Amino acid sequence: IYPRDCPQPMKEEYLLTGSLEPTNEPYAIAKIAGIKMCENYYRQYESNFISVMPTNLYGPNDNFNLETSHVLPAILRKMHLAMCLENDDWNSIRKDLDKRPIENISGKASNEEIINILSKFSISLIQNSANVSLTLWGTGNPKREFLYVNDMADACVYLMENLDANDLYSMEVTHINIGIGKD
C-alpha cells in the first residue's frame, strides 16, 4: 500500500506520498480505502477502530503452489525440493508433488518429467554432479520482512487491549505497521 519508491524501512507517514506499484495498485487502493474508512468513522462517530498494516505474512495453510504463491512459501518449497533432489530423496519429492502437483506433474510422473518441471522453476541437477542448482529470482536487492501469522494475531490482541484509537489519531497516525521495521 506504500508508494513504489518508498524509503526503507517503511514508516506509517509514507502512506500516500507517491505513486503506487501498478501491478499492486488495486490491492493497495482497497487497503488504503479501509484505513481511511476507519479513520473517518473515528472522526465522525468516535468509534475505537485501529487499522494495522502487516508485513508479509506466512503460516499454516499458506499457498505453496510455485505458480501462484507469495515469496516466502515459494522459497521454502523450492529449498525443500532442492534439498530432496540433492539428497536423491525421490520418496519425499513424490510425496510433495502428490500433495501439490506442479503444472499437473504429480509424484506419479517419471524422474525425467519431475526433473524437467523442477528445472522450469530453477531447481536443477548440475550436470555430472550430485549437486543441485537453486535460483530463487530477481536481483536480491528488494528488502522483505516476514511475520508469522500467530505473531500478527498477538500484535492485534495487544493493540486492542492497550491502545485507544484516540491515542493513535491524536498523533495524526492513521494506522500501525506490524513488523520489525529495521534494515
Please provide the spans of the model-predicted regions.
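Alpha-helical substrate-binding/gating segment
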Residues: 43, 57, 73-135, 144-176
